[in-house]
Amino acid sequence: RDRSVSRGLGDVYKRQAVLDGPEAGYKVTYTQADAEAVTAEDGRVILMDEHLADSDAMDYDMDRADGEWALSDYVQKGIEVLDNGTGFFMMCEGGKIDWACHGNDPATVFEEVVDMDNAIKVAYEFYKKHPKETLIVVTADHETGGLGLGTGKYELQLKALAKQKQSQDILSRSITDLRKMRKVINWPEMKEFLAEKMGFRK
């Protein structure tokens, strides 16, 4: 049995890139440093993200380490490599907006939407240089989690979400790690933990 299949689709894609990429004429990069060094002269390139999180996806923007590439960096590099005299097509997906909505994690959702917006801004800067020959389409295939905006009053305290320091996924992992270290955790300790990670009142 192919172990890469059991570990998730991300491993399958990585394996295909490693085995099939060079054979098909693609240069494959495995580190961010190598990706940063890629130029249009390199021709056809597959950039593998070395900082993959759960299910082999990019980290949530909220969880991204300093210096780690955001979606906008990939768009910028894509434009640098693809920009030529004959034109090009690029598709960019802010796919983890959907993931955060599935987890009903609004603070992370907002951060992901801003991350996507930053990627669009990069594309828009390119558009301003080539307005007569550039089309940018921004769309969504579905909504998840019941997120909506209306004209009535809300009880949701959005400012409180700004205190959240990590995604629900990382929070769950942190709690699991805490329980592995200590079988019994009292409520004052948990309150301290939640205050640090999520901005809850002590």
Where are these regions (language model features)?
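Acidic, Ser/Thr-rich peripheral helices and adjacent loops at domain boundaries
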Residues: 15, 112, 152-174
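Metal-dependent active-site segment of extracytoplasmic phospho-/sulfohydrolases and closely related
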Residues: 115-157
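Loop/turn elements at helix/coil->beta-strand transitions in domains of secreted/extracellular proteins
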Residues: 23-27, 41-45, 83-89, 130-135
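Single conserved hydrophobic/aromatic residue that forms the stacking wall/gate
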Residues: 2-13
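Active-site His/acidic residue clusters
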Residues: 52-65, 83-87, 91-119
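Structural recognition of the beta-strand scaffold that forms the well-ordered cores
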Residues: 7, 29-30, 46-49, 88-93, ...
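Solvent-exposed loop/turn segments at secondary-structure junctions
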Residues: 11, 34-36, 52-55, 94-99, ...
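Active-site neighborhoods of enzymes that stabilize oxyanions during catalysis
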Residues: 166-202
